[in-house]
Amino acid sequence: MKFFIDTADVNEIREAHELGLVDGVTTNPSLIAKSGRKFEEVIKEITGIVDGPISAEVVSLDHDGMIREAEELAAIHKNIVIKLPMTPEGLKACTTLTKKGIKTNVTLIFTAMQALLAAKAGATYVSPFVGRLDDISQDGMGIIDDIKTIFDNYGYTAEIIVASVRNPIHVLNAALIGADIATIPYSVMLQLAKHPLTDAGIERFLKDWEKVPK
């Protein structure tokens, strides 16, 4: 399974990349706003760190506006993937961009049927939001399982990006289901490497080492 990092913080991206964990990056307007920097400046810097897909989201809600923004973003770097909202206009834009050879990531997906529509429109990636579904007492990972089954049944090539990841269990379940990608906040990436028995083992080794004659 591939790991994308879900952030626009270039320091987090750089640190995760140095760990060898980053296959790609997902950003959105909210994450860019948190960085306090200009949008294009952030995206360009990210392309210099990670040699993999970098999702950048359009903010227009109409087809023509999305296409205009998408072409501007795609011109920044060959690795840019255009994030589109899961709406009728977004699907229309996805179809147009696919014909132009521009990669797309249809986002804000909350049902398996929405993912199917995105795949039929030619999406390169689909991004179901598991954490937000869990927040309203729905089964986020169950949606991932359904999407995987549908795509396997019909041979869709769109890759599943498990998004809105809140904890290591989300990542574990995504891997068990067979999702292609999990896009993970840096804080959760660090949690994946942690276990209290690992920490206790290191502490014990160090204490034992102190007893070794020098």
UniProtKB/Swiss-Prot annotation:
Pfam family, one: TAL_FSA
Keyword Cytoplasm among UniProt keywords: yes
Keyword annotations of the record: Cytoplasm, Pentose shunt, Schiff base, Transferase
Any GO CC annotation of this UniProt entry: cytoplasm
The protein's annotated pathway: Carbohydrate degradation; pentose phosphate pathway; D-glyceraldehyde 3-phosphate and beta-D-fructose 6-phosphate from D-ribose 5-phosphate and D-xylulose 5-phosphate (non-oxidative stage): step 2/3
Catalytic activity: D-sedoheptulose 7-phosphate + D-glyceraldehyde 3-phosphate = D-erythrose 4-phosphate + beta-D-fructose 6-phosphate
Function: Transaldolase is important for the balance of metabolites in the pentose-phosphate pathway.
Membership in a protein family: Belongs to the transaldolase family. Type 3B subfamily.
Protein name as it appears in the record: Probable transaldolase
Gene from which this protein is expressed: tal
